[in-house]
């Protein structure tokens, strides 16, 4: 199994434990993680430094999360810059967040512009052998986050993959397994985000649209059917990354170790 986690988690771990980022990266590797998800905005201008950090820990780039604003502007320069970074860091995938609604926006019109921007991005990426995926973002201002919205976008952008985030559908009160069935054949990347209804290490949590408090949890220990999701992916022949995600965990090292152990042992 190809397990990854986020550079943001390593930075949180570093701050929590008072250790260097290099030490945090090595802890990830020792935990059974082989890939790291980067953020374009945090990495731009520091590519060589990031590559050296990951190389030293025996880690590779799993993907690059990039925020666009296709609903309000054409962004050819950002498209090319993100693709340049992906090639420089040997990243096979860019996870695109295409843009958000602003007050007064016409949702339907913005959604069409987001689809057009994603089609442009996918066309440019295909020329470089890079894949593009988009996740179900957990924000009310993201008109591509609910399962039907995600399906609509996938239909409008044939080359777009689904970065399936297991936790974000719960934010909208949607059933993750129903969402899975709707997008299964387009899943090219997975964010393994488990959620609990109580904190484990003093986490503040996030309030869902159903007014339910949701807290990050080590993968396999929360309220979501993570084992069933992995089983379905495995039976389908999915061979992509499983990205451990629990931002704002009270103890990132503990969460990371438990999550990686659960994933690496699930088929043993």
Which positions does each model-derived feature cover?
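Residues at the N-termini of beta-strands
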Residues: 35, 93, 189, 240-241
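A cross-domain feature marking catalytic cores of carbohydrate-active enzymes
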Residues: 5-9, 38-42, 63-68, 96-98, ...
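Short, electropositive alpha-helical surface patch
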Residues: 55, 59-60, 146-158, 220, ...
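N-terminal pre-domain/capping segments
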Residues: 1-92, 119, 126, 161, ...
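Aromatic/hydrophobic pocket-lining residues that form the small-molecule binding cavity
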Residues: 21, 47, 75-82, 111-114, ...
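Acidic-and-aromatic substrate-binding clefts and catalytic sites of carbohydrate-active enzymes
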Residues: 12-16, 35-49, 68-77, 102-105, ...
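Active-site acidic/histidine proton-transfer and metal-coordination neighborhood
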Residues: 30, 56, 60, 71-162, ...
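Acidic/histidine-rich catalytic cores of soluble enzymes
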Residues: 36, 120-223
């Amino acid at each position: 199994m190809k397990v990854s986690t986020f550079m943001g988690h390593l930075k949180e771990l570093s701050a929590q434990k008072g250790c260097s980022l290099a030490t945090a990266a090595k802890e990830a590797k020792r935990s059974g993680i082989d890939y790291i998800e980067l953020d374009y905005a945090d990495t731009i201008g520091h590519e060589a430094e990031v590559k050296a950090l990951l190389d030293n820990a025996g880690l590779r780039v799993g993907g690059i999360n990039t925020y666009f604003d296709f609903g309000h502007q054409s962004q050819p320069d950002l498209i090319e810059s993100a693709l340049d970074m992906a090639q420089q860091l040997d990243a096979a995938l860019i996870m695109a967040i295409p843009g958000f609604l602003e007050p007064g926006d016409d949702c339907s019109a913005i959604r069409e512009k987001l689809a057009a921007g994603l089609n442009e991005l996918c066309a440019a990426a295909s020329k470089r052998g890079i894949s593009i995926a988009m996740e179900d973002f957990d924000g009310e201002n993201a008109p591509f986050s609910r399962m039907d919205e995600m399906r609509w976008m996938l239909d409008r952008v044939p080359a777009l993959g689904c970065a399936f985030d297991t936790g974000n559908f719960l934010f909208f009160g949607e059933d993750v397994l129903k969402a899975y069935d709707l997008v299964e054949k387009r899943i090219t990347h997975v964010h393994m985000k488990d959620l609990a209804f109580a904190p484990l290490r003093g986490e503040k949590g996030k309030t869902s649209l159903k007014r339910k408090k949701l807290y990050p949890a080590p993968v396999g220990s929360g309220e979501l059917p993570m084992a069933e999701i992995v089983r379905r992916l495995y039976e389908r022949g999915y061979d992509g990354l499983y990205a451990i995600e629990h931002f704002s965990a009270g103890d990132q090292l503990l969460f990371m170790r438990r999550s990686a152990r659960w994933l690496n042992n699930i088929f043993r």
